[in-house]
Amino acid sequence: MSEEFRIVWAEPLTAFCQKVFEKIDVPSQDARTTSEVLVLADLRGIDSHGVARLRRYYTGLKNGVMVPKPKMKVIRESPITALLDGGAALGQVAGLKGMTMAIEKAMTNGVGFVSV
């Protein structure tokens, strides 16, 4: 049995994934962020965290395991640290929020740590 490979360019694949997320009520920017991360994982050879997970995310969003429009909130915060409740967001979205907060803290205070 021979395997067939199909070349799929990154941008059309990203756009497809984004449309899937948007169809289940994920805001456009969050859909784009998540789609870009999935495709980049595949491009880096980390297939376990790539587009193959799209069905799992779709099912999780439909079943309420993940929330398409999460209400993320800061639980605790100091000048250099924060604890962020991701609100059952897609991990890529919550991770980006936490990373952005950590960078802002580091720019202001020299170091920043955020736990999501």
Task: Identify the residue ranges that each predicted region occupies.
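Secretory-pathway/luminal and periplasmic proteins that interact with or process carbohydrate-rich
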Residues: 42-48
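Generic N-terminal amphipathic, Lys/Arg-enriched alpha-helix
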Residues: 1-24
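Flexible, glycine/charged-enriched surface loops at secondary-structure junctions
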Residues: 25-33, 48-50
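Active-site cofactor/substrate anionic-group-binding motifs, chiefly glycine-
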Residues: 49-103
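Short polybasic/polar patches that bind polyanions
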Residues: 22, 39, 107
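Short glycine-rich or small-residue beta-strand-to-loop segments that form or flank ligand, phosphate
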Residues: 20, 83-88, 112-116
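Conserved catalytic cysteine-centered active-site region
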Residues: 101-114
